[in-house]
Amino acid sequence: MNPNFLDFEQPIADLQAKIEGLRLVGNDNSLNISDEIARLQDKSNTLTESIFGNLTSWQIARLARHPRRPYTLDYLEHIFTEFEELHGDRHFSDDAAIVGGTARLDGKPVMVIGHQKGREVREKVRRNFGMPRPEGYRKACRLMEMAERFKMPILTFIDTPGAYPGIDAEERNQSEAIAWNLRVMARLKTPIIATVIGEGGSGGALAIGVCDQLNMLQYSTYSVISPEGCASILWKTADKAADAAEAMGITAERLKSLNIVDKVIQEPLGGAHRDPAKMSESIRADLVQQLDMLGKFDNDALLARRYERLMSYGL
């Protein structure tokens, strides 16, 4: 099985393998087989549209975790310029599961903060698989307060299974770190835009998710618990994860219908990992437009709007 394709994408993977095989044959023998390659590519695109037009909630959850999906640092490279990473919470240590720093978007200074999972084994371990400890959230809080002080908008990228539940994190008061971020973000006198780019897991996501504008990528998820965790509680087995995902309403379109999400950003055919540059350009365009819109509010109006937005949840 091709690791770049999930099991429900295998028919697409088979066609792509045939296309690559024909390209190799053409390169080796100087044969003109472009018509056959074009025919197979059209067939692959049609099949991809069919499969991705009927995804279940569980399939979307798995896409949100795809190992090739762009992470925060990938978007930082494509969307922003002059990124300068800042480290440490000034209390305990640095946390590589959250990256953040100053950058420029369309020439304007912004503060960018996001979860980072890591690709290779060593990096995954160093970044704790994108699960921040308290020092990660305290670092994020420090950067957000700095952004307010220097009148910079805050842009966050959410992609985490959840806050780290280990004993060391609990000893350093994980719940307090998350709660404090919620309190601070609700009162910051600067525009905040949050974008869920992969998994939006529980309080670990909310801790950098209180905002004036919430975006979700088309194949991202946002939930209070993972489908496997929910299934383990309700049915005593993770095998019911697909049923849990459907019942929980974790997808972008579902959350948009509930007015929890403000904007669903469409992904390239096959997901963001198929064309990171195109995905980045879509995000960049939306962020620029949204910052222009939020920039029209003075501080009092911005905070009032944020409060009303938060209080409208569940109504």
From Swiss-Prot:
Q: Which InterPro entries match?
A: Acetyl_CoA_COase_a_su, ClpP/crotonase-like_dom_sf, COA_CT_C
**Does ATP-binding appear among the keywords?**
yes
Q: State which Enzyme Commission number(s) the record gives.
A: 2.1.3.15
Q: Cell inner membrane as a keyword?
A: no
Please list the GO biological process terms of this entry. Answer: fatty acid biosynthetic process; malonyl-CoA biosynthetic process
Q: What is its main location?
A: cytoplasm
The family database entries (Gene3D superfamilies) matched by this protein are listed as: 2-enoyl-CoA Hydratase, Chain A, domain 1 (3.90.226.10)
Q: Name one GO molecular function term.
A: ATP binding
Listed pathway(s)? Lipid metabolism; malonyl-CoA biosynthesis; malonyl-CoA from acetyl-CoA: step 1/1
What EC class does the entry list? Answer: transferase
Gene Ontology cellular component annotations, sorted alphabetically: acetyl-CoA carboxylase complex
SUPFAM superfamilies assigned to the protein according to its UniProt record, in alphabetical order: ClpP/crotonase
According to its UniProt entry, the function of this protein is described as: Component of the acetyl coenzyme A carboxylase (ACC) complex. First, biotin carboxylase catalyzes the carboxylation of biotin on its carrier protein (BCCP) and then the CO(2) group is transferred by the carboxyltransferase to acetyl-CoA to form malonyl-CoA.
Instruction: Please give the subunit comment from the record.
Output: Acetyl-CoA carboxylase is a heterohexamer composed of biotin carboxyl carrier protein (AccB), biotin carboxylase (AccC) and two subunits each of ACCase subunit alpha (AccA) and ACCase subunit beta (AccD).
Q: Which family does the similarity line name?
A: Belongs to the AccA family.
Q: This protein is called what? A: Acetyl-coenzyme A carboxylase carboxyl transferase subunit alpha
Q: Which organism is it from?
A: Pseudomonas putida (strain ATCC 47054 / DSM 6125 / CFBP 8728 / NCIMB 11950 / KT2440)
